[in-house]
Amino acid sequence: MPEVPVLACIALDQGKIGNVHQVTSQVIIKKEADMKIALALSGGGFRATVFHLGVLARIAADEQDLFSQVTYLSTVSGGSLCTGLVYSINGFRWPTAKDYLEQIVLTARRMMTTYDLQGSLLRRALRHLGSILETRSDDLSELLREGWGVTAQLHEVPSHPRWLINATCYETAKNWRFEPHRMGDYVFGYSRDTNLPLADALAASAGFPGLIGALALKTGERTWFRYKHSGAEDPYTSLAVQQTWETTPITPAFPEVHLWDGGVYDNHGLEGLHDFSHGWRNNVDFLLVSDASGTSSAPPYRQRVKALYFMVTGIMMDQIRSLRARAVLDRITQHDDDGSYLKIGNSCHKVLTEARRTQDLETYCPMCMDETAVSQAAAFPTMIRKLSQAEFDLLFRHGFEVADYTLYAHHADTSLPARFKFLGYESIRNQIGF
């Protein structure tokens, strides 16, 4: 397929929301027909947040201008925090690849290694001992506004890329999605009144039970509806088409809903992108799943309540994640759906060997993190505390490299929809500044 060079691109000035533009000197190699790329960013605390930042860096570094072709984002917990941080740093607009690599990554590193989100949350709880067992979701939302600058309202987020922020509704046990134009789930119903803080949606998506807890959303303050059209819940039906479908007004079944960590229901954020029967949703050419769920280990036996808690949050959730991951891999390997599954903890040697590219082992593996460092990244605990620079760099580099060698291993020789070269982490060092 011939490639068309584009000599310049438009980039947003840092700190501006689209009023001032400047032409950069970045050279982009643009494909004949752009892909519609969907990103699913999993949960996993700051382990996931930084891993995903590294994955995004690999996409931004690609010569095919893939970053501008990101059309859909579906995020959970740490993935939602990652996306919210990127938007906040860039004035609540999706950045250019150049701005992401040269400005946003370094700013995100500084913020995550100087501001202690978890410590601030704990200090707030200790100041109010009478409510220490209550949900801390409201506190997390406020800290995201104060410490990370997540000050926009949900409805102010641009419609492109289309961003689904996934939570779990306790009352319906379904995947509750926050979008700029609507929120809700197909059992409870939907509301177009999304005049609420973006930080609230992020806090709900990251509200792990027992650690942060649920966001209580009062329903009587908004109008709600259901679609009469059977396919209207498809999140990737165009907004213009959705607005032509008939709706039925409804009275909320509950005066408030409690919205928990999206990872309780679907830690990969796949339900809005993938259907078990039909594969990718409409208008998705390439699905990129970034899975930083972490690795499970065998804990010592726990009795009574602790045993039950592990059964629910450990074994059962791990099985749900495994089933969804297998379904995606089946679509990629056995059907026509194109995409890639990027798993934390996968080393270069493992990925190239499984892809039957053993001839590349001596060339590329020495350029990547060794097995010990990869294992350290995968075993990093699920938390939202301040990171050291070494911790950030470990997780970020691992995310970049997993994306780099996985995309190369499985898409180097194909033209549908993209060919990926191995870039190596050193290729972006000068741009990211560390």
Language-model features, listed with the residues they occupy:
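Patatin-like phospholipase
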Residues: 32-40, 45-138, 179-181
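Flexible loop/turn segments at secondary-structure boundaries
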Residues: 45-49, 80-83, 172-174, 266-268, ...
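Active-site gating loop/helix substructures
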Residues: 47, 117-131, 157-275, 429-432
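Conserved N-terminal structural segment that caps and organizes enzyme catalytic cores in eukaryotes
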Residues: 66, 136-159, 164, 177, ...
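Short secondary-structure boundary/capping segments
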Residues: 87-93, 178-185, 219, 273-277, ...
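C-terminal helical/tail subdomains of lipid-metabolizing enzymes
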Residues: 253, 259, 264-267, 272-277, ...
